[in-house]
């Protein structure tokens, strides 16, 4: 089969998505390929007020205009083969590249010290990014040998880019600046997962393991040294083992499980291993759920613990020079968030009610602090909270059918308790 899809989006600008798919099937063989072109523009207007209390109180009032232009080429090719109704294998190779990726940032800043105007700045930053081809390879096998179910998949991912930033800064009270910066980033990830399931005591028992290895190289250079240059490297090994048992009983269905996770993180700066920022730790996370029916009401209660890894962007060692009073930076030492979730859901006809409580450890937040103790420069970056972040949410939704119409209404509230001493 063959399929062509073209999408046109009109707002302040024009966005385009063009995609072609081809597919061939014969007996148990399924072969496929895809090619896609994306043209996207992004515009943002933001007003930001920042206050830094040091020897004096620094107030920054920024007006930012950001324009982003991207063109992406994506493609994949692969095959699936079904030996019989219980056993199949597959492989897919994906590639992605960007012939054009540039952005422009215009910033107008008013700077005050102890309530008196200290300076006014006009900044223009032009960024050009040369993206390397991103490669991803995935292979899987799902099958059954007797009563034993097997699910295996493996992935490899590679990406990288070279970005050059040029900033021109005009000051009413101080010298003007030209800032030249470059970032060279390379990412590699390999992962594999195996799950084995077998019927036990009228239920199903599953065991498995997962392995993930991540390598990242991140070099940043500022020619004028307004922002410190840096060369860093990160290696992370994650090994997970898990087990789960599920069964239906007279009063409902339940699932009991646990996951063991071992993480080893090594951080290098200028090819030297940094012991204080490297770490390894072990954790065990349980999960349990139970669902049943009480009359016409379906209900479920569950408890899970999940980890959320910080993105490559947050882990970046690169810096963004906004102006001489504001610098944005990544944080390569961010830890994964660990969230404990307790949820209850009930549904009756077209009504659904849900209550949830979350407790997040190492929550990632956006943070500002002095770049140096005696300087009036704000360093903006993501950090891990040193205390747990509790959150409660409650939602009710209705989706009744009225004639030919299906209406949906949702009401909810989310409440968090967090106090930060500054």
Would you name each region that the model predicts?
Residues 1-108, 126-160, 186, 190, ...:
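Membrane-proximal, glycine/serine-rich, low-complexity loop/turn segments characteristic
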Residues 189-193, 230, 234, 238-240, ...:
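Outer membrane beta-barrel strand-and-loop segments of large Gram-negative receptors
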Residues 5-7, 58-65, 120-127, 174-182, ...:
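Extracellular loop and loop/strand-boundary signature of outer-membrane beta-barrel proteins
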Residues 206-293, 302:
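Signature of Gram-negative outer-membrane beta-barrel scaffolds
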Residues 48-56, 106-116, 167-175, 222-228, ...:
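Flexible, surface-exposed loop regions and adjacent strand-edge segments
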């Amino acid at each position: 089969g063959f399929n062509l899809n073209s999408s046109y989006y009109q707002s302040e600008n024009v966005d385009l998505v063009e995609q072609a798919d081809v597919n061939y099937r014969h007996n148990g063989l399924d072969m496929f390929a895809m090619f896609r072109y994306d043209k996207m523009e992004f515009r943002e207007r933001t007003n930001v007020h920042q206050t830094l209390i040091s020897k004096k109180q620094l107030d920054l009032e920024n007006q930012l205009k950001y324009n982003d232009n991207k063109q992406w080429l994506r493609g994949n090719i692969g095959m699936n083969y079904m030996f019989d109704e219980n056993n199949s294998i597959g492989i897919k190779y994906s590639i992605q590249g960007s012939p054009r990726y540039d952005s422009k940032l215009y910033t107008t800043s008013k700077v005050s010290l102890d309530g008196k105007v200290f300076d006014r700045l006009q900044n223009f930053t032009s960024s050009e990014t040369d993206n390397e081809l991103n490669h991803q390879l995935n292979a899987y096998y799902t099958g059954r040998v007797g009563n034993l179910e097997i699910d295996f998949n493996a992935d490899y991912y590679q990406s990288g880019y070279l970005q050059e930033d040029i900033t021109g800064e005009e000051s009413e009270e101080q010298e003007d600046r030209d800032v030249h910066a470059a970032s060279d980033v390379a990412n590699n990830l390999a992962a594999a997962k195996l799950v084995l399931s077998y019927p036990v005591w009228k239920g199903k028992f599953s065991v498995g393991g997962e392995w993930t290895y991540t390598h990242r190289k991140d070099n940043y250079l500022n020619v004028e040294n307004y922002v410190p240059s840096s060369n860093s490297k990160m290696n992370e090994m994650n090994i997970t083992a898990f087990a789960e048992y599920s069964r239906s009983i007279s009063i409902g269905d339940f699932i009991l499980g646990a996951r063991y996770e071992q993480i080893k993180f090594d951080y290098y700066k200028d090819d030297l291993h940094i012991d204080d920022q490297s770490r390894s730790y072990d954790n065990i996370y349980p999960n349990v759920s139970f669902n049943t029916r009480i009359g016409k009401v379906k209900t479920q209660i569950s408890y899970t613990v999940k980890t959320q890894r910080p993105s490559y962007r947050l882990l970046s060692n690169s810096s963004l020079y906004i102006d001489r009073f504001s610098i944005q930076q990544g944080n390569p030492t961010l830890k994964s968030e660990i969230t404990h979730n307790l949820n209850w859901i009930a549904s009756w006809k077209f009504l659904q009610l849900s209550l949830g409580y979350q407790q997040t450890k190492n929550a990632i937040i956006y943070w500002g602090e002095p770049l140096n103790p005696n300087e009036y420069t704000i360093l903006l970056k993501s950090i891990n909270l040193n205390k747990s972040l509790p959150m409660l949410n409650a939602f009710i939704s209705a989706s009744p059918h009225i004639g030919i119409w299906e209406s949906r209404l949702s009401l909810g509230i989310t409440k968090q308790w967090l106090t930060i001493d500054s």
